[in-house]
């Protein structure tokens, strides 16, 4: 009550922010007459002037009013477009490292030019991030004339660019690209073997367009660079044949109830689990088909891989539906459909064997599984930027998440013209058939009065179902979904013409405005070298049609189902009513819709259906509240999942930072001999300690064992017995020194044969490749650990704490193994001449580069942080564990502090 009263008196935080920014808008507007009087050359010279002032110590905030005024004036001259005051406010919000919520049609692309120009002045580069290649290329080409007029360079970052072109693109002042490509470039840079092969420079400032889609919808989907693993396509095919024999059980097993079904499905969390009966039945089938020994169990450590395959096949059959989650294209490939945009994602593959299981289910060629070489989530990639900002039409519903995870405040920017769209209440029918009949009637009415309609569906399957119903009703329409995305621009250009009917899966076509009356630009582009008269005639004709559409009520939005997230519903609505245009929207629902079926209580469902007759609709505030409550519930659960995922990924992220910093250090220096020398001392000392324990009696020494170990591991012939016989006063410390000195002498002899520089290059090459191999193994071990960690909850242990503890132990093993493996390789290598080492180094590099070339970028399946594990605790990461290892005292501490281990957590040991 008091909060509401205070808000009325002093305004909300958003109101106060807007008041503060409007004062700066006045300042920018005051520069307008002065800048209008400047010649083109004088206006262009402003960029050089601003850069000089920055060098003299002026801040970007101090330059902001003049810089924004410069961009606005340049835009007027280049495009004949003047930034509105609300766009200036949006630009300031972005410059402040915040999220600007701007409605569809308010000119987000033009708004982004303001902070992009200002933040490109220091010369560190600005990244403008979009959701797909088409938008990245379109926005770069649209804004290129403006930035080049002001003396700035513009680049585009899209997949499959040649390395040199990509490197040049990153040197541009302003770089447009997709979120995936920026993330993958970061991972690829951290797999490179030479500095000149890296493309990215520092991550200074990013403007993320459609920020909700990238930082929220895709937050659960890690980016993965993977390489080929072993072929197990036959196993997928054989297990795929068993799954159709399993029966679904509606209720979970409990102490009081044990069903006779084989698996249960949790639709809320999108999980499928084998029941006890199911496990026994699958084991029987496996034995019968020669996949398992009699009396063996699926959950024994030796059968981990079989359980993994069964789970993948079960998920493929039960949770993943053709034409909803994926399509099979003409080439017989399974292509993922993005659940948020309805677009296909060629080249992306689900991980953990799921893609292969779907291929087996569809009977197409099964491609090899991949092994993770590097991975990162968008959450952690975008937090690497010094300053991050974003734009979207719908962020307010997720403002809390942006603030708590990314530290980004959301500012709602007012529209340039008042919004007059009529958002009508939802109507609910008993069945889907009744709902579709009502939608067809609504569309008929709109077509008759010449009003364009955009119909949003949640899947390809539903869009085709509706399309067939419209064909029967003889209503002409266009379908925009993953199957027909090649015609996307053409369909969107026509979607605003009188009486047009467009069915769009989810938010396909997002990023392109639907212009009432159709797109006159598309008609102009269709002409070859159009004259001014032709362009004027097209514009005049368009104006007439535009006014006609406005009179008919503007664009009408029909939602065929409520999405789990209110934000996606708002995005669909936001396609209408742009820039103060007329428009309307309505959602048609049925009690068979998944959201209502899963999340509405049985009491509410029976209450609604009891008084309804066939074809009758219900409009109820209580029902609308119930639906919104269900959506909030789902949003809350999804937020918790993303937050938990981040907490787990933060553990890997701290370790990733240590590994990548070590890699950076190795890449930036030519001579790592000091590091090698220190590592050699640490490794040999650790081995000596095993056979000659510190401060022990001579009777406890295993001299023969030590001699054999030094020979086997390091090819070192140390005559320790002889030394002890020759000098009976040779004590433990002096002996240690003697062995270390001998190892150094032997190594120095190699250096004399091949030359110092050749050996330095070889050391660096061995160190980098060993680090990459161990990191790859470590990622696999972390995956296995993660999948089985939820089982610790049954032992009254905190899975998160256990995960942190065990992953730290794994990381200790990695750092110790790095030293041991590098010293072993360098010690055992035998050389006669310089050319041999050069040839070996070239061979190792060629192998590594071939592996990198064969690596592919992919998305993992969206993760649940505590999903049902496919591994038992014992089998989860056993093969990867290196026992009896410790972090080297001079290594970076795995906690990520940046200090040496001995000066940080090493003090505690």
UniProtKB/Swiss-Prot annotation:
Residues 899-909 have a biased composition (Basic residues). Residues 854-863 have a biased composition (Low complexity). SUPFAM superfamilies: Helical scaffold and wing domains of SecA (SSF81886), P-loop containing nucleoside triphosphate hydrolases (SSF52540), Pre-protein crosslinking domain of SecA (SSF81767). It comes from the Bacteria. May bind 1 zinc ion per subunit. It is an enzyme of class 7 (translocase). One of its GO terms (cellular component) is cell envelope Sec protein transport complex. Keywords: ATP-binding, Cell inner membrane, Cell membrane, Cytoplasm, Membrane, Metal-binding, Nucleotide-binding, Protein transport, Translocase, Translocation, Transport, Zinc. It catalyses: ATP + H2O + cellular proteinSide 1 = ADP + phosphate + cellular proteinSide 2. Residues 834-909 are annotated as: Disordered. Belongs to the SecA family. Part of the Sec protein translocase complex. Interacts with the SecYEG preprotein conducting channel. Has a central role in coupling the hydrolysis of ATP to the transfer of proteins into and across the cell membrane, serving both as a receptor for the preprotein-SecB complex and as an ATP-driven molecular motor driving the stepwise translocation of polypeptide chains across the membrane. This is Protein translocase subunit SecA. It comes from Vibrio campbellii (strain ATCC BAA-1116).
């Amino acid at each position: 009550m008091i909060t509401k009263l205070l808000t009325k008196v002093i305004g909300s935080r958003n109101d106060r922010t807007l008041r503060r920014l409007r004062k700066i808008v006045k300042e920018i507007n005051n520069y307008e007459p002065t800048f209008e009087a400047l010649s083109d050359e004088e206006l262009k010279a402003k960029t050089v002037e601003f850069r000089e002032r920055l060098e003299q110590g002026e801040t970007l905030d101090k330059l902001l009013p003049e810089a924004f005024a410069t961009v606005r004036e340049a835009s007027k001259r280049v495009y004949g477009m003047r930034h509105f005051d609300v766009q200036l406010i949006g630009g300031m919000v972005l410059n402040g490292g915040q999220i600007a919520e701007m409605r569809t049609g308010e000119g987000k692309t033009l708004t982004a030019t303001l902070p992009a120009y200002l933040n490109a002045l220091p010369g560190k580069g600005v990244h403008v991030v979009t959701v797909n290649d088409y938008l990245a290329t379109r926005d770069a080409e649209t804004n290129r004339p403006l930035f080049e007029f002001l003396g700035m360079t513009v680049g585009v970052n899209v997949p499959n660019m040649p390395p040199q072109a990509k490197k040049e693109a990153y040197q541009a002042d302003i770089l447009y690209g997709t979120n995936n490509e920026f993330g993958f470039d970061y991972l690829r840079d951290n797999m490179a073997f030479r500095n000149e092969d890296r493309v990215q420079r520092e991550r200074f400032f990013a403007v993320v367009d459609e920020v909700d889609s990238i930082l929220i919808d895709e937050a659960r989907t890690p980016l993965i660079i993977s390489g080929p693993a072993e072929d197990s396509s036959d196993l997928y095919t054989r297990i795929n044949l068993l799954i159709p024999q399993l029966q679904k059980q509606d209720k979970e097993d409990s102490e009081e109830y044990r069903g006779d079904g084989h698996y249960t499905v949790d639709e809320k969390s999108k999980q499928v689990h084998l029941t006890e009966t199911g496990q026994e039945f699958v084991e029987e089938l496996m034995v019968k088909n020669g996949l398992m020994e009699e009396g063996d169990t699926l959950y024994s450590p030796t059968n981990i891989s079989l359980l993994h395959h069964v789970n993948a096949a079960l998920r493929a059959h039960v949770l993943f539906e053709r034409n909803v989650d994926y399509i099979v294209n003409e080439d017989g490939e399974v292509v993922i459909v993005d659940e948020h945009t309805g677009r296909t994602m060629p080249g992306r593959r689900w991980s953990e064997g799921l893609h292969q299981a779907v291929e087996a289910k569809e009977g197409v060629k099964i491609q090899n599984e991949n092994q993770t070489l590097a991975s990162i989530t968008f959450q952690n990639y975008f937090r690497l930027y010094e300053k991050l900002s974003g734009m979207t039409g719908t962020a307010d519903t997720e403002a809390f998440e942006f603030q708590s995870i990314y530290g980004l405040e959301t500012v709602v920017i007012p529209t340039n013209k008042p919004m007059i769209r009529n958002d009508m209440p939802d109507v609910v029918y008993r069945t889907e058939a009744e709902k579709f009949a009502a939608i067809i009637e609504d569309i008929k009415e709109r077509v008759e009065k010449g009003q364009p309609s955009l119909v949003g569906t949640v899947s390809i399957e539903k869009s085709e179902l509706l399309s067939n119903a419209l064909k029967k009703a003889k209503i002409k329409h266009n379908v925009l979904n993953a199957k027909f995305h090649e015609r996307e621009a053409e369909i969107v250009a026509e979607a605003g013409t009188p009486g047009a009917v467009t069915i769009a899966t989810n938010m396909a076509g997002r990023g392109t405005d639907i212009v009432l009356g159709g797109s006159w630009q598309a008609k102009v582009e269709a002409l070859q070298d159009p004259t001014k008269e032709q362009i004027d005639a097209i514009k005049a004709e368009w104006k007439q049609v535009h006014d006609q559409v406005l009179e008919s009520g503007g664009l009408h939005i029909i939602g065929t189902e409520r999405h789990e997230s209110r934000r996606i519903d708002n995005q669909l609505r936001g396609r209408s009513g742009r820039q103060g245009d007329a428009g309307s929207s309505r959602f048609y629902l049925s009690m068979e819709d998944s959201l209502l079926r899963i999340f509405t209580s049985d009491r509410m469902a029976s209450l609604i259906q009891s008084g309804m007759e066939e074809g009758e609709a219900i409009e109820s505030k209580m029902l609308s509240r119930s639906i919104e409550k269900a959506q909030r519930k789902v949003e809350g659960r999804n937020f918790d999942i993303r937050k938990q995922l981040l907490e787990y990924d933060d553990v890997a992220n701290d370790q990733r930072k240590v590994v990548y910093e070590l890699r950076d250090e190795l890449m930036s220096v030519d001579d790592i001999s000091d590091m090698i020398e220190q590592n050699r001392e640490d490794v040999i000392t650790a081995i000596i300690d095993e056979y000659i324990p510190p401060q022990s009696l001579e009777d406890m020494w295993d001299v023969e064992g030590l001699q054999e170990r030094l020979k086997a591991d390091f090819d070192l012939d140390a005559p320790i017995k002889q030394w002890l016989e020759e000098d009976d006063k040779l004590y433990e410390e002096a002996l240690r020194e003697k062995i270390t000195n001998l190892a150094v002498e032997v190594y120095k002899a190699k250096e004399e044969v091949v030359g110092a520089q050749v050996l330095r290059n070889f050391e660096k090459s061995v160190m980098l490749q060993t680090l990459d191999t161990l990191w790859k193994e470590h990622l696999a071990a972390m995956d296995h650990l993660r999948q089985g960690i939820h089982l610790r909850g049954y032992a009254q242990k905190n899975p998160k704490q256990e995960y942190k503890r065990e992953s730290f132990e794994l990381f200790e093993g990695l750092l110790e193994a790095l030293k041991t493996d590098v010293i072993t390789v360098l010690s055992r290598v035998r050389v006669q001449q310089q050319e041999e080492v050069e040839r070996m180094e070239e061979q190792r590099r060629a192998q590594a580069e071939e592996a990198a070339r064969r690596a592919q970028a992919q998305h993992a399946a969206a993760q649940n942080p505590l999903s049902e594990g496919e591994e038992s605790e014992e089998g989860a990461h056993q093969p990867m564990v290196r026992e009896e290892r410790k972090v080297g005292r001079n290594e970076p501490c795995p906690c990520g502090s940046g200090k040496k281990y001995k000066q940080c957590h090493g003090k505690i040991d």
